């Protein structure tokens, strides 16, 4: 039997060629085989001694390692016909390079002798990384942990890398670090960082005798607020008083001098602005104090009040706010401002004019100071307003005299009236508008609309509405009392009208079978409607005065019923609305409710 031979191939490290050789099959033991290979390569061949690994190549050209006796027996079974073992040196570990890196890091960790941080000693502070106590050098305090400190060597070694560390160069640092961390700066809160002064340095250099500035107090007040979605909107509302005082200041010299000496000019009374809403947010429990502050003339504020050198934040456009703030928050904020405006207007009217019985002076010049051209123009406007009031027909004359308020006598563009009841109590209308041209000492002012949600429908009426309403300031006690609105009667009218609509629908369903019955049913319905309104029996002359708004009888009756409830048909908007819903009052009220919510 021929002797078995084992072929070995050695590829050494470096540019030397690989070595191929045959060995007599030494043994079936892997340890003896490995000893024979090392003896041949490193003693007989004089090759550099190193650790080697043995493997063989299978039919798939893959390297199969031979590590123990089991691997060697598998090799003998697989390669019995052609035994070929590959020998290669193990990959050397780069120990010199690692030693060099350790030396460089040791040199970097060793601080310089002249470093001033070596002389800083933090008493009663222990390094949680190496246990150095007291801590010498820079102290690194973890912001997120309750009590975790590192020395500068441990921080350089990147211990505790997952949290934010704060460097403290001295021993007099604050105990609580969280108070000095806030969110992204908005408005005046970012002024502290933009001006570049440190809060620690500011406390050391602050003058105890000096009074803090106005902006600093506002910064502290705003710093207590949490940053949220409406932070930018709240800051805009707090800046509104500073912007409105400069805008209303040029209009004050136009007032009469006598009014300035005797009484203070009520700047906030003619129009309810967002300034009142901002004041009500700041002091909602002190409404009377706000009214007494308004009695002080505002012309002295720019002179006596010191202004800071910091520029005020400009008023943000509402279009930009609508892109930042969600629509539901925006609508809720506008509704809150409207409620505050209405509340403040009622408080001002009742406290200034209702209790004392003396109305506030007008902000517009009187008829004595007007030029002849302006007097002629005002007289023309008053004549046009009186003509406009008399030109609009009324659906129920007796209801206008007893139950319907006087605001319904004129054509109103709003659905439920734009002048509330509280304002009508303190601002009675002049019962004699034709005598306004003769009484030159009578002052005039605009009527306020405290409900900004309603929109004008008729442009012609909006031009006539610019006329001023005369106020009787000479004899306020003789003002007529406002008639009380009878909601019970209006509800009864609505109920009767709904019954009438049901009867009309039932009658129209039977028109194909009994036309004669339909005519009698409509006739009886008309008689019931005439009796339900509660008016006196119509005379032949009175029938001509009743206006016809629509050719359809049911729609025309619906229009008269809604006008009796206080709605206006100016511009035929009520006719178009009831025509679109086939005279159904319930559907018309639903449509108006949806349109009001959208506005």
UniProtKB/Swiss-Prot annotation:
Consequence of substituting residue 397 to S: In strain: FrenchSlow
PB1 domain mapped to chain residues: 3-88
Zn finger (ZZ-type) location: 122-173
Biased composition (Polar residues): 305-319, 397-417
GO MF annotation terms: DNA binding; K63-linked polyubiquitin modification-dependent protein binding; polyubiquitin modification-dependent protein binding; protein kinase C binding; protein-membrane adaptor activity; zinc ion binding
Organism: Drosophila melanogaster (Fruit fly)
Region entry 3 X 8 AA repeats of S-A-N-Q-S-X-X-P, spans: 386-413
Gene inactivation effect: Males are sterile, spermatids exhibit degenerated mitochondria. Reduced activation of the Drs promoter. Double mutants for ref(2)P and scny die 96 hours after egg laying.
Lineage: Eukaryota, Metazoa, Ecdysozoa, Arthropoda, Hexapoda
Effect in UniProt of substituting residue 247 to D: In strain: BPL_7A, BPL_9D, BPL_10A and BPL_11E
Subunit structure: Interacts with aPKC and Traf6.
Biased composition (Low complexity): 375-391, 511-536
Name under which the protein is recorded: Protein ref(2)P
């Amino acid at each position: 039997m021929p002797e078995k031979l084992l072929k070995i191939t050695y590829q050494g490290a470096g540019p030397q060629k690989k070595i191929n050789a045959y060995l007599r099959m030494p043994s079936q033991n892997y340890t003896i085989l490995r000893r024979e290979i090392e003896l041949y390569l490193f003693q007989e061949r004089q090759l550099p001694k190193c650790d080697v690994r043995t493997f063989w190549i299978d039919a798939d050209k893959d390297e199969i390692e031979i590590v123990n006796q089991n691997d060697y027996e598998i090799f003998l079974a697989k390669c019995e016909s052609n035994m070929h073992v590959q020998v290669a040196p193990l990959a050397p570990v780069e120990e010199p390079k690692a030693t060099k890196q350790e030396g460089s890091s040791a040199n970097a960790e060793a601080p310089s002798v002249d470093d001033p941080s070596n002389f800083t000693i933090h008493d009663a502070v222990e390094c949680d990384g190496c246990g150095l106590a007291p801590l010498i050098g820079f102290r690194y305090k973890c912001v997120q942990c309750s009590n975790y400190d590192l020395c500068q060597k441990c921080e350089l070694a990147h211990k505790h890398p997952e949290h934010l560390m704060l460097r403290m160069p001295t021993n007099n640092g604050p105990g609580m670090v969280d108070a000095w961390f806030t969110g992204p700066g908005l408005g005046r809160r970012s002024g502290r960082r933009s001006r570049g002064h440190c809060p620690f340095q500011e406390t050391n250099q602050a003058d105890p005798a000096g009074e803090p500035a106005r902006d600093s107090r506002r910064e502290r007040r705003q710093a207590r607020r949490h940053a949220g979605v409406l932070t930018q909107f709240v800051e805009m509302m707090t800046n509104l008083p500073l912007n409105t005082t400069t805008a209303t200041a040029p209009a004050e010299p136009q007032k009469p001098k006598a009014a300035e000496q005797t009484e203070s000019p009520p700047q906030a009374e003619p129009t309810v602005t967002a300034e009142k809403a901002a004041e009500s947010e700041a002091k909602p429990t002190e409404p009377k104090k706000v009214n007494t502050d308004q009695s002080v003339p505002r012309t002295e504020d720019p002179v006596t009040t010191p202004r800071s050198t910091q520029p005020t934040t400009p008023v943000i456009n509402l279009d930009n706010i609508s892109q930042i703030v969600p629509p539901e928050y925006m609508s809720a904020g506008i509704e809150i401002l409207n409620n505050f405006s209405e509340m403040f207007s009622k408080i001002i009217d009742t406290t200034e004019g209702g209790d004392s019985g003396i109305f506030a002076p007008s902000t517009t010049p009187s008829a004595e100071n007007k030029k002849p051209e302006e007097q002629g123009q005002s007289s023309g406007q008053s004549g046009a307003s009186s003509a406009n009031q008399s030109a609009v027909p009324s659906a129920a004359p007796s209801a206008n005299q007893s139950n319907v308020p006087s605001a319904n006598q004129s054509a109103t563009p709003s659905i439920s009236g734009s002048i509330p009841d509280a304002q009508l109590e303190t601002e009675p209308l002049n019962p004699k508008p034709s005598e306004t041209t003769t009484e030159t000492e009578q002052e005039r002012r605009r009527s306020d609309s405290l409900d900004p949600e309603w929109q004008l429908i008729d442009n012609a009426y909006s031009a006539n509405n610019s006329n001023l309403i005369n106020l009787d300031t000479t004899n306020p006690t003789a003002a007529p009392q406002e008639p009380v609105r009878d909601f019970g009667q209006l509800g009864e009218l609505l109920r009767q009208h709904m019954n009438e609509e049901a009867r009309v629908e039932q009658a129209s369903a039977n028109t194909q079978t009994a036309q004669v019955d339909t005519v009698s049913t409509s006739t009886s319905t008309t008689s019931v409607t005439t009796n339900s309104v509660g008016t006196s029996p119509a005379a032949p002359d009175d029938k001509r005065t009743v206006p016809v708004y629509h050719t359809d009888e049911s729609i025309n009756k619906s229009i008269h019923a809604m006008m009796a409830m206080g709605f206006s048909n100016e511009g035929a908007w009520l006719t178009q609305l009831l025509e679109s819903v086939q005279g159904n009052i319930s559907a018309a009220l639903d449509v108006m409710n949806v349109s009001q919510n959208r506005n």
